[in-house]
């Protein structure tokens, strides 16, 4: 099947202008604050949620969905981290990557999956509130696969999924019926990389497919951390290799997204890469390393166990923010928060209590 892309339904920079910070707050140029919002550890963040253990993939619909690898669930948050009532169990357990599906494909029990999840068990599952409000449903299963990341795009023939198989060292594709698409030996593959670097994540950012590669320990099946231990390759939306970014700053990279416009002129629209290996976040433009995101103290931001990064919206977090998820203490605990320009406030107000929630018992997803 030839993949001809018309649009990408994954990470993109918001086209809306970021709201200006309040007059009393003067953001420091190219410096950022980290705000902890939710954790399973009491006192670590403003909100305590015992389900938030080793939070991995993030997906933004009307609200923010979080894949909790440690509890086999997906939980939902709005505003500045307020937990919604929706809570979904993921069959196959340990959800990793996650995408929001706007289309009519990828049906589960006759309904299009609103959110789709990948799992190290080789399962890809979908959730629709009408099909089953409390459980995702298995749509595809690949024996022996270890899916660490997931992306969604659209083609002339419909949408398709891309899943990073960390065990097999390949990117797999699935059509809207959750059936595997047979790819050529060169599609979504960087054959010049060392054999022990495997796809750790895949994302669609700024109209390109990006694949993050990490060094895989064959004995444990886990990623290996270390300075410049990682690659990030760029493909067009037909799977043809078109480039590779600098290895400067890479350390078991996983998160891939575009910097929101509200993060300032230097970074707006740049590719942001978050390292699982050392918890730092680096920006790249045209393949060139722009530097690490730094805190107000001018030190590189470090978030131990960093997994995903997701731009905020006017309703959820703010248009000048970047959501992050991290599996603290070696994945035994979890942290969800935002990164925003130093001195700035979130451009979205904290939502009031339950009276303002969606009338749906499953929240506004």
Predicted regions and their residues:
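Sequence/structural signature of beta-propeller domains
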Residues: 24-365
